[in-house]
Amino acid sequence: MEKMMHRETERQRRQEMASLYASLRSLLPLHFIKGKRSTSDQVNEAVNYIKYLQRKIKELSVRRDDLMVLSRGSLLGSSNGDFKEDVEMISGKNHVVVRQCLVGVEIMLSSRCCGGQPRFSSVLQVLSEYGLCLLNSISSIVDDRLVYTIQAEVNDMALMIDLAELEKRLIRMK
């Protein structure tokens, strides 16, 4: 009688372990399984996959933090460290900052969401007139303000672009 109970318990344990291994196998991506493997190989691949995911999480966290620092710098528009002055400038009417960046020119345009912001197509037209080609554009809403961050490169390297003049032109736009 005791032997039969022991066999039944062992059979249930094996079935449960088989279902747990199947569940583990179903959670792993195909490139971590690679054909029919022993259970110890599957567990090792699961450990490798967990380590891989932990590395990716760390990399993405660092990337997120870097992007947040960049976006804060872009939003504030200056590196002089005068945070209060920058916030006051941005919280007023339309605000434009034009500066050089690695790829060419970066433009940060901020305006109230409720109206008065220049149309994006008008901004693109001005960039085209100055010989700039749009590379990247990000728009977001921050504290009831519409913020465009635009990166553009110079089409013709022979052209010298007056950043102050471009900034004034973008400020005058309605």
UniProtKB/Swiss-Prot annotation:
InterPro entries: bHLH_dom, HLH_DNA-bd_sf, MASH1/Ascl1a-like. Keywords: DNA-binding, Nucleus, Transcription, Transcription regulation. One of its GO terms (cellular component) is nucleus. Residues 1-53 form the bHLH domain. It is found in: Nucleus. It comes from the Eukaryota. Expressed constitutively in roots, leaves, stems, and flowers. GO terms for molecular function: DNA binding; DNA-binding transcription factor activity; protein dimerization activity. GO terms for biological process: regulation of DNA-templated transcription; regulation of transcription by RNA polymerase II. Disulfide bonds: none annotated. Homodimer. This is Transcription factor bHLH36. The lineage of its organism: Eukaryota, Viridiplantae, Streptophyta, Embryophyta, Tracheophyta. The gene is BHLH36.
